[in-house]
Every structure is written in C-alpha cells, then in structure tokens.
C-alpha cells in the first residue's frame, strides 16, 4: 500500500466516524454515564431525573406523578418536596409484596423494576408517556442511591 492510499483510507475512516457521531440521537454523556452534576443523592435524583423536563418542556416523571391539578398516577407524587416520603419503604399499590424503594437493595426495589422494564412489573415500563426511558447512567445513579441506603439527602 502506498502512503497516498493509507492517507486516503485514514481520511475516509475519520469522515465515517464523524458522520456516525453527528448522526447519533444520544448524547455521548448518556452513553458513557450520568450527566455532570447528577449525584447518587435523593435531592439530585428528585431535581435532575424525577422533575426534569425534555427539550419540549415535558416532565420525565412529574408529567403523571404530580398532585398539581390531578390525582398522581399510582398515588405517587414525585415532586421533590413529597417524593421521598412516597417512595422509601412504601408498598406498591399495584404489586402486592413489592416495595417502591428498599433502602440498601436496588435489586428488590420496585421502582428499579418499573424503570428498567423488568418482566415482573404490573403495567408498563416507566416513564411511559414522556418520551425516552432513563439512560443507563441515570439508572446507575438511582441504583447507587438506593444501595447506599436511600437517604433523604
């Protein structure tokens, strides 16, 4: 292979990589992990996940799980000032024996099952109406918060 052929192949590879990255709908931070500033604390999760909005202004979770002008879906109000008391050690209203958040045990926390769309859930994966599901990075932060004791921090 000549130097010119190798140079041309490198240019084509660089352009192909650029086209793939530019055409991707997901942000690289969504693929790699949580966005900067998102921490495994309740206050960070409540503000940056539960009450966050997309580019169209739709709330990821509080579009349905709010008491503002309505009864919250599943009786679960995820506004930051009330969410903790309605999540931690609270039984699911639809799945007998399931607890929404089991401190120290993300694998047995029903909210994780619902957000990941596991086969044992009642109803649909969440969030169901507001667009994309949570990223792997966001789920990792929620799991870490639960596994470290689900503190109201």
PLM regions: where:
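Solvent-exposed helix-loop boundary motif
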Residues: 28-39, 43, 47, 54-132, ...
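Post-cleavage N-terminal segment of exported redox proteins
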Residues: 1-42, 143-153
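Residues within well-ordered alpha-helical secondary structure of globular protein domains
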Residues: 51, 117, 144-148
């Amino acid at each position: 292979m000549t130097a010119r052929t190798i140079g041309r192949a490198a240019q084509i590879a660089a352009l192909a990589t650029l086209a793939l990255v530019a055409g991707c709908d997901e942000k690289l931070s969504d693929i790699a992990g949580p966005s900067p500033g998102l921490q495994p604390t309740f206050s960070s999760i409540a503000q940056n996940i539960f009450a966050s909005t997309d580019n169209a202004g739709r709330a990821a979770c509080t579009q349905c799980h709010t008491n503002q002008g309505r009864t919250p879906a599943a009786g679960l109000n995820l506004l930051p000032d009330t969410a903790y008391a309605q999540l931690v050690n609270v039984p699911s209203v639809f799945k007998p024996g399931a607890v929404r958040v089991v401190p120290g045990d993300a694998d047995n926390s029903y909210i994780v099952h619902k957000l990941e769309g596991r086969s044992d859930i009642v109803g649909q994966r969440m969030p169901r109406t507001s667009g994309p599901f949570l990223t792997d990075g966001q789920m990792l932060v929620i799991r870490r918060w639960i596994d470290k004791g689900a503190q109201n921090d």
